[in-house]
Design a protein with these regions (language model features):
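Helical "lid/coupling" subdomains associated with nucleotide-phosphate turnover
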Residues: 2-8, 20-25, 30, 36-70, ...
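Post-signal peptide N-terminal segment of secreted/secretory-pathway proteins
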Residues: 12-13
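Active-site-adjacent helix-turn-beta-strand microarchitecture at beta-sheet edges
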Residues: 78-81
Length: 403
C-alpha cells in the first residue's frame, strides 16, 4: 500500500483497519508496529463509524434519495455483524446492528456442519430468531418496498439472476433463484457464479442471509449498487476536504434518528420542540463566546431531543437512564465520541458537571469543554420551559456586554 502511494506520489491518505482489531488484546502494539514499518497511521473505527462510512457510499447515488421516500432498508452484511437502517419518507427511522455476521455464524456452526444433512436449515434457524425480533419491533408501522444490499457476493448473485446486468430486481425473482442455489454445495455454486475461490465456507452463509432478509422484510425489490466501505472512505475523504459537494443531508439523518428514538421512549414532543428551538437560539446568539461550530450545533439539537428519554424507564433516575439509552443506541452519523458527548450533555443537564479528572476515561479535554458548554445551554433553555407549557413565544436572544 505504501509503495503504491509512493508510486502515485500521493501526499495525503486515510487508512482504516477492520473493527476486528478491537477484539485483539495487543491492538495498540500491532498498530504501532505497522506505523514504524510503513509510516502509515491507521485508524480503527467503531462499529457505528464503520457502518456510516459504508452508508455514505450508497447515499451519494442519485437513486438513493428517491428510493428512500417509499420505505427502504439499507442492509450491510459483514463478517462480524449485520447492520439494518430503515428509511421512511426520506428520513431515518432506526439503525440496528445484529450479531449475524458471516464469520460469527460460521464459528457457531463449525461443530455441526459435517454432521447435518441440510446445513442451510441450521443457518436459517440461527438467523430467523433475530430477524423476527427486529420485525416485531420496527416493522409494525413501516412497509418496506426496497432493500439495498451491501456485502460480498451480492453482485455475483445478481448477475446470475439478472442476465442484463440490472442492479435493481424484483424481490420474488431473487428469492426464487436463491432457493434453487440452496440445493447445491459451495463448489457447485461457485462454479455457477464463476468464482475463483470455490471453497469459501462463507458463500452459503451470505446466500441464506440475503434470502431470509428479503423474505422477512417482505420487500418488493432489491438494489445492489455494487459499492463497499472503500467507496465510502473515498467519498468521506472527498467530502471532508471539500473536493465534492454532498448530495445527501446527513445532518437530517442524525436528527431524524434522534426524533425516532425519542418517540420510542414517549418523549413529550411540544416540550422537546420548544427546548430544541430555544437551545439553538442560545447557541447562535453566543457563537463568539463559545467558539463552537456547525457540528456542535447538531450535537446540541440531538441532546435536546433526547434529554427526557430516560423518564420512560425511571422518573426518579431519568438522567442516568437517558445516558445509558443514548450510549446503547446507534444514531447514524454520530461517532462513538460524539454519542458520548450527547449522553454526557443530557446527564449534566440535571446534575452538576464533574471535574475533568472524573471523566478523563471517557472524554478528552476538547470533548469535556464541549460537554460543559452544551450542558450549560441545555440547562438555560430547559429552565425557560420548566412547566412544559411553552409559555414563551417569539423569543429572541442576544449578548449584551458580558451577559
Amino acid at each position: 500500500y505504501k509503495k503504491i502511494m509512493d508510486g502515485y506520489r500521493a501526499d495525503a491518505y486515510t487508512a482504516y483497519a477492520s473493527g476486528v482489531f478491537r477484539d485483539v488484546k495487543n491492538e495498540l502494539f500491532v498498530l504501532d508496529q505497522l506505523y514504524i514499518r510503513t509510516g502509515i497511521r491507521i485508524q480503527v473505527p467503531s462499529n457505528s463509524e464503520h457502518r456510516f462510512i459504508g452508508y455514505k457510499s450508497v447515499a451519494f447515488r442519485e437513486e438513493f434519495d428517491e428510493m428512500t421516500k417509499q420505505g427502504t432498508a439499507v442492509v450491510d452484511i459483514g463478517g462480524g455483524n449485520l447492520q439494518v437502517t430503515l428509511f421512511a419518507d426520506g428520513r431515518v427511522v432506526t439503525t440496528q446492528h445484529m450479531v449475524l455476521g458471516t464469520m460469527r455464524l460460521r464459528e457457531q456452526l463449525s461443530g455441526i456442519r459435517q454432521a447435518v444433512a441440510h446445513y442451510e436449515n441450521q443457518i436459517e434457524e440461527l438467523v430467523n430468531k433475530d430477524l423476527e425480533v427486529f420485525k416485531s419491533l420496527y416493522l409494525k408501522d413501516n412497509k418496506i418496498k426496497s432493500v439495498i444490499f451491501m456485502g460480498d457476493y451480492i453482485m455475483d448473485l445478481m448477475k446470475k439472476v439478472e442476465k442484463k446486468g440490472n442492479k435493481i430486481m424484483a424481490a420474488e425473482k431473487f428469492v426464487k433463484a436463491m432457493r434453487k442455489l440452496y440445493k447445491k454445495n459451495a463448489e457447485q455454486i461457485a462454479s455457477e457464479l464463476d468464482l475463483s475461490h470455490e471453497n469459501d465456507p462463507l458463500l452459503i452463509l451470505y446466500i441464506v442471509l440475503y434470502t431470509r432478509i428479503t423474505e422477512e422484510l417482505n420487500a418488493e425489490e432489491i438494489w445492489a449498487p455494487g459499492v463497499n466501505v472503500s467507496d465510502g472512505m473515498a467519498y468521506d475523504y472527498a467530502e471532508r476536504h471539500k473536493i465534492i459537494r454532498p448530495t445527501h443531508n446527513f445532518d437530517e439523518d442524525i436528527l431524524s434518528a434522534a426524533k425516532q428514538l425519542s418517540k420510542r421512549y414517549e418523549g413529550f414532543s411540544p416540550h422537546i420542540d420548544a427546548l430544541t428551538s430555544m437551545s439553538v437560539l442560545v447557541f447562535d446568539a453566543m457563537k463568539k463566546v463559545h467558539g463552537m461550530g456547525r457540528r456542535e450545533r447538531i450535537l446540541l439539537q440531538t441532546a435536546a431531543i433526547l434529554h427526557d428519554c430516560g423518564k420512560y424507564v425511571s422518573l426518579a433516575h431519568g438522567p442516568e437512564c437517558a445516558y445509558h439509552i443514548i450510549m446503547e443506541s446507534e444514531i447514524i452519523g454520530l461517532t462513538h465520541l460524539e454519542r458520548q458527548i450527547v449522553a454526557c450533555a443530557v446527564f449534566y443537564n440535571t446534575y452538576p458537571l464533574e471535574d475533568y479528572e472524573e471523566l478523563a476515561d471517557r472524554l478528552d479535554q476538547n470533548s469535556y469543554m464541549t460537554v460543559a458548554k452544551l450542558s450549560a445551554m441545555l440547562r438555560v433553555s430547559n429552565a425557560m420551559d420548566r412547566s412544559h407549557k411553552q409559555k414563551f413565544k417569539n423569543v429572541k436572544a442576544s449578548v449584551r456586554g458580558k451577559q
